[in-house]
């Protein structure tokens, strides 16, 4: 919850990313939280996997669902692979039937049920069906089954939570980002959250009394009052997993990695590699 959300398409790596930030670093506590549903893995904020605290999943989905649906639909239309709303509705009905009773099933197991129900269940269709069900708040990650990801019904996995207004959600998202990622800029927050600049700017204004700002390098940098970093570099070495928030959580990464070395840490199409950190800078 402190981080807001953490990018999680590499399931093994994101468990490391969470575990190394604990007071007593380790993976077991993370796996237990995932199994018990205290931490969930779903498509949120941007059209990719993220880990999110159970108590935050509903308001974050409400804030980002339409953007993710639009992005996915545009991709499908551009590749001539559209799925009708009737097909999505049918998939949601099947999911409700087969997952009811706090069941957790893998994507392959769900695909078998889809096929028997007359739905296309190749990898493309399954990815689209499950992503839509996630952003609609129908399913989320289920109980852990080794290295296999499972799905469960969100309403059976997560107890009811209070609804937030849009302004409350924007403020809460900005708070989570700037307390865990500061110092950061408006552009960084917009990139991380998936919010357009107008809404990102509104989010910052909603929590302005809680923020300190500094002008540096022709940009405004924000730090939340509850940010835990002292701002002092340590001599410690850190091995960061791929897709770690230390890099992926910002639009501009040149403060910790020279632009000419970007290709050593991540590719143009969004693949991020594990890196070695020394005194706050990527050195390998």
Located regions from the model:
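Phosphate-backbone binding and catalysis cores of DNA-processing enzymes
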Residues: 1-108, 112-122, 259
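Short amphipathic alpha-helical interaction segments
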Residues: 24-32, 120-132, 197-204
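A short, conserved structural fragment
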Residues: 35-44, 48-49, 134-144, 208-215
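Short, cationic-aromatic polyanion-contact patches
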Residues: 51-57, 145-167, 221-230
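Positively charged, polyanion-binding regions of nucleic-acid-associated proteins
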Residues: 86-103, 166-182, 204
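Active-site-proximal binding-pocket segments
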Residues: 170-228
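Non-catalytic regulatory appendages
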Residues: 206, 210-260
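Low-complexity, glycine/alanine/valine/leucine- and proline-rich hydrophobic stretches
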Residues: 237, 245, 252-284
């Amino acid at each position: 919850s402190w981080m807001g959300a953490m990018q999680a398409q590499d399931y093994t790596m994101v468990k490391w990313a969470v575990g190394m930030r604990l007071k007593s670093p380790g993976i077991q506590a993370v796996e237990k939280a995932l199994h018990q549903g205290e931490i969930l893995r779903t498509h949120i904020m941007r059209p990719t996997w993220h880990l999110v605290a159970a108590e935050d999943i509903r308001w974050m989905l409400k804030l980002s669902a339409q953007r993710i649906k639009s992005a996915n639909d545009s991709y499908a239309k551009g590749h001539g692979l559209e799925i009708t709303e009737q097909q999505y509705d049918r998939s949601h009905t099947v999911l409700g039937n087969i997952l009811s009773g706090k069941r957790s099933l893998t994507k392959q197991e769900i695909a078998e049920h889809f096929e028997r129900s007359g739905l296309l269940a190749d990898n493309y269709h399954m990815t689209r069906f499950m992503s839509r069900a996630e952003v609609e708040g129908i399913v989320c990650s289920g109980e852990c089954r080794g290295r296999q990801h499972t799905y469960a019904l969100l309403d059976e996995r997560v107890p009811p939570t209070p609804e937030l207004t849009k302004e409350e959600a924007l403020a809460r998202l900005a708070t989570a980002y700037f307390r865990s990622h500061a110092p950061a800029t408006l552009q960084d927050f917009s990139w991380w959250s998936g919010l357009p600049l107008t809404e990102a700017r509104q989010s910052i204004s909603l929590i302005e009394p809680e923020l300190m700002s500094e002008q540096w390098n022709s940009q405004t940098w924000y730090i939340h009052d509850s940010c835990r970093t002292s701002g002092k570099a340590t001599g410690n070495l850190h091995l960061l997993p791929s897709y770690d928030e230390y890099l992926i959580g910002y639009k501009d990464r040149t403060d910790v990695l020279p632009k000419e070395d970007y290709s050593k840490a991540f590719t143009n199409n969004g693949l991020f590699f594990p890196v070695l950190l020394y005194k706050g800078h990527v050195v390998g």
